[in-house]
């Protein structure tokens, strides 16, 4: 898990850009609506919905907007029927890339994703080609808190692991199903997460340099600009020096 923050920072940088374009709200609402449609409309009983609601709140979406999206999904009806599809592929320096999509047209989506890979010097793989390199986990990030107190509270709440990064931030890992429970317990104990999400954590990393890092960024940009793409995960590791130039 070491180095997770390095590639997470890329995602957070891109998320900020998306927010400026207004795209992130659209994608969050689609995820909330779909999660409520295919599962329990109560976030407390639906880990996927809870994660989507948490992400929306982190992005400053109002409770009213979130509740409307949940109600629309729970109501079913003739609304947009979307399915989740995950594509796998390879980026520069052999980096592994997973692309999570919500779509109503598989043919359109796979064509757009394949085009992004080919234009960025990567290639779309087959099912299972890189998925084995990732594990789905809940991730809560904290800054400026007492490390020992947080660790005790997190482990008592059922967290899998607690890791202190080089920059002093503390990352708490959970199973996807325990994400909401641990988040609630830590908030009740007075710990406010700077970021909380269910994400894909790589087991190995691909080191990227000043030449290959911009190519990965181009691929991520192209993929996240696609309307059907919800999330992009990768195992590229970029040093602080190289990241500062991006």
Swiss-Prot record:
Entries under SUPFAM superfamilies matching the protein: YebC-like
Cellular localisation: Cytoplasm
Pfam families reported in the protein's UniProt record: TACO1_YebC_N, Transcrip_reg
Primary residence: cytoplasm
GO annotation, cellular component aspect: cytosol
GO MF, any single term: DNA binding
Keywords: Cytoplasm, DNA-binding, Transcription, Transcription regulation
GO terms, biological process: regulation of DNA-templated transcription
Homology family: Belongs to the TACO1 family.
NCBIfam families: PRK00110.1 (NF001030), PRK12378.1 (NF009044), YebC/PmpR family DNA-binding transcriptional regulator (TIGR01033)
Protein name: Probable transcriptional regulatory protein ASA_2843
Organism: Aeromonas salmonicida (strain A449)
Lineage of source species: Bacteria, Pseudomonadati, Pseudomonadota, Gammaproteobacteria, Aeromonadales
